[in-house]
């Protein structure tokens, strides 16, 4: 139809150039009416075959040139407000939400890392503080132990008497008592009652006085008092001697004749001690040794060993070890080899160290009496017996000369 109209318009144009005849004038008029109707309907003006344009400003045009509205084509009023790509808009919103979530998780991770670093720093500070406190405590313990050791070894001014106490006790009981310090533990003594300084000073002054003296006589007889260190040594020796006497008396067997022996021993000790105490002098070591040896000798007399068909064996009252080593008579008779508790008393034997088991001190012994010695054959026994006989004969010859 559009083609036919164009052909008609072309014919009309030809007719205008070449005036048609009257026979064709009716057709031309009819053709012009068709073009006017078309122009009124669509607003299309044809000026020529080469130039074609759309006239949308015609006054007679009641329609607007716009694309047809289809279900696929969006509404122009709404398309201007929204994007042309709804799927891309949804993906952009999703991307923004994902980006926000990523940023939130990143900041949360940074915060957790900062908290972890702070906790590690606090733990390191606590560990360093604990190590420093432990080192300070160890240093304090070492310093305290060194201080105590220095006080014990060197002896401070206030503990000067205590440092000499051990020396005096060792000198007084050397060779006559064992080195067991547990028997003279003074820690079990009852605690002293707290007194005013004045009464305590008077009591100390009264302790330094001889027996039978009154502390009120200090002002009149101040020149006859004992020095404080000397009185302290005397008190310590007296206490040690009382411990020895009480221990020896407590282990005496219950026999009818032991009461007289105990009374005799107590009388001897009291007379010997009364000399020193009456004069205000410290007890001599000889008096202590005499009292302890008398009790030891009495205990040895009460012991009767029944061996070899109940034959009584005499207990030696001298040191056999010193006798075998050709010591002087005074040394031999001054002590015995062992005490009532089977502890070594001989000072020379106490210093001997057994080459087999390494025993010394209270359990010191020679190789002959070593419990860990190897089995001796008959040849070894014969050699030892011959050596013993030769040695005894040699000593006898020396004694005769």
Swiss-Prot record:
Outcome recorded upon mutating residue 335 to Y: Strong defects in abdomen and oogenesis
Which segments carry the region annotation Disordered?
181-207
Q: Does the keyword Membrane apply?
A: no
Annotated phenotype, changing residue 361 to E? Strong defects in abdomen and oogenesis
Q: Where is this motif: C2HC 1?
A: 319-346
Consequence of changing residue 364 to T: Strong defects in abdomen and oogenesis
Please give the biological process terms from Gene Ontology that the record holds.
Answer: anterior/posterior axis specification, embryo; dendrite morphogenesis; germ cell development; germ cell migration; germ-line stem cell population maintenance; negative regulation of apoptotic process; negative regulation of synaptic assembly at neuromuscular junction; negative regulation of translation
Per UniProt, subcellular location reads as: Cytoplasm, Cytoplasmic ribonucleoprotein granule
Expression tissues: Posterior part of the embryo. While the transcript is present throughout the embryo, nanos translation is controlled by smg, and the protein is found in pole plasm and pole cells. In the female ovary expressed in germline stem cells, precystoblasts and in maturing cystoblasts; in early cystoblasts expression is post-transcriptionally repressed by bam in a 3'UTR-dependent manner.
* InterPro entries per UniProt: Nanos/Xcar2, Nanos_sf, Znf_nanos-typ
Give the comment on domains: The Nanos-type zinc finger is composed of two C2HC motifs, each motif binding one molecule of zinc. The presence of the zinc molecules is essential for the translation repression activity of the protein.
Can you state the subunit structure given in the record? Answer: Interacts with pum and brat. Interacts with cup. Interacts with mei-P26; possibly involved in regulation of brat levels. Interacts with wh; may be involved in mei-P26-dependent derepression of the BMP signaling pathway. Acts via the formation of a quaternary complex composed of pum, nanos, brat and the 3'-UTR mRNA of hb. Binds RNA with no specificity.
Function according to Swiss-Prot or TrEMBL: Maternal RNA-binding protein that is required for germ cells proliferation and self-renewal. Acts by forming a complex with pum and brat that regulates translation and mRNA stability. The complex binds to the Nanos Response Element (NRE), a 16 bp sequence in the hb mRNA 3'-UTR and prevents its translation. Controls posterior development. Rescuing factor for the abdominal defect of posterior group mutants. The other posterior group genes are not required for nanos function but rather play a role in localization or distribution of nanos protein.
Q: Which family does it belong to?
A: Belongs to the nanos family.
For this entry, the protein name equals: Protein nanos
Gene that codes for this? nanos
């Amino acid at each position: 139809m559009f083609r036919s109209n164009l052909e008609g318009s072309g014919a009309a144009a030809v007719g205008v150039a070449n005036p048609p005849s009257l026979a064709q004038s009716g057709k031309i008029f009819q053709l012009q009416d068709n073009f006017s109707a078309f122009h009124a309907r669509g607003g299309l003006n044809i000026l020529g075959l080469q130039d074609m344009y759309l006239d949308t400003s015609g006054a007679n045009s009641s329609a607007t040139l716009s694309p047809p509205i289809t279900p696929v084509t969006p509404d122009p009023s709404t398309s201007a407000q929204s994007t042309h790509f709804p799927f891309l808009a949804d993906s952009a919103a999703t991307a923004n939400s994902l980006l926000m979530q990523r940023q939130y998780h990143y900041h949360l991770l940074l915060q957790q890392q900062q908290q972890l670093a702070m906790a590690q720093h606090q733990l390191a500070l606590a560990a360093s503080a604990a190590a420093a406190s432990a080192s300070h405590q160890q240093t304090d313990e070492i310093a305290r132990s060194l201080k105590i050791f220095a006080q014990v070894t060197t002896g401070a001014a206030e503990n000067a008497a205590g440092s000499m106490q051990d020396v005096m006790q060792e000198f007084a009981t050397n060779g006559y008592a064992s080195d067991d310090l547990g028997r003279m533990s003074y820690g079990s003594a009852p605690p002293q009652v707290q007194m005013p300084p004045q009464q305590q000073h008077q009591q100390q002054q009264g302790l330094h006085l001889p027996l039978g003296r009154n502390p009120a006589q200090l002002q009149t007889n101040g020149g006859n008092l004992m020095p404080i260190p000397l009185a302290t040594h005397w008190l310590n020796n007296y206490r040690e001697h009382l411990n020895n006497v009480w221990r020896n008396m407590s282990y005496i067997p219950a026999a009818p004749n032991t009461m007289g022996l105990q009374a005799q021993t107590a009388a001897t000790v009291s007379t010997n001690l009364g000399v020193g105490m009456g004069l205000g002098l410290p007890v001599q070591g000889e008096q202590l040794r005499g009292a302890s040896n008398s009790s030891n000798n009495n205990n040895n007399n009460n012991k009767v060993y029944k061996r070899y068909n109940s034959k009584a064996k005499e207990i030696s009252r001298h040191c056999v070890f010193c006798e075998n080593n050709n010591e002087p008579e005074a040394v031999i008779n001054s002590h015995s080899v062992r005490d009532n508790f089977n502890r070594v008393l001989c000072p020379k034997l106490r210093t001997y160290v057994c080459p087999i088991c390494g025993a010394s001190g209270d359990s010191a012994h020679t190789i002959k009496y070593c419990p860990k010695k190897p089995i001796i054959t008959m040849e070894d026994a014969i050699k030892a017996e011959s050596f013993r006989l030769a040695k005894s004969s040699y000593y006898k010859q020396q004694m005769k000369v």
